[in-house]
Amino acid sequence: MSKIKKFIKKKKKSKIVSLTAYSKNIASILDNYCDLILVGDSLGSVLYNYKSTREVNLSTMIEHSKSVRMGIKKSLMIVDMPHNTYRTPKEAVKNAKQIMKKTKCDGCLLYTSPSPRDNTGS
């Protein structure tokens, strides 16, 4: 059974544990306790003292994700896609493929806002 299928099966039965890592050493410690490890664009604020996560670029996320991947044996690894790397669907797919190929992550995370046309009335 794949890691993703195991994750989904576990999620249906119990709560999952997810934490953020930016390096191999931290990831190797967290791997024993987490179901999912996120490489967050928050590394800009935490490690580089950026005022905003919007200053983080794709190459920085890829390099940190490659480091984190080396510390993970069992957890899923998800990588934040930096701001302005998914302005169009085509750009999102291109950059997600690049992240996944170079880092061997299990998925990419991007943040969106509801479209004004998506008014659900709630």
Model-based region annotation:
Residues 33-36, 103-104:
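Glycine-enriched alpha-helix->loop->beta-strand junction motifs that scaffold or abut catalytic
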Residues 17-20, 37-39, 77-81, 108:
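Hydrophobic faces of well-ordered beta-strands that scaffold small-molecule active sites
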Residues 1-20:
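N-terminal amphipathic alpha-helix/helix-capping segment at the start of soluble metabolic enzymes
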Residues 38-60, 83-86:
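Glycine-rich, proline-tolerant flexible connector loops at the mouths of alpha/beta enzymes
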Residues 111-122:
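Single conserved hydrophobic/aromatic residue that forms the stacking wall/gate
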Residues 53-79, 117:
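Alpha-helix-loop-beta-strand connector modules within alpha/beta enzyme cores
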Residues 74-105:
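Glycine/small-residue-rich loop that forms an oxyanion/phosphate-binding "nest" at active or ligand-binding sites
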Residues 23, 30, 68:
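Conserved, mostly hydrophobic/aromatic
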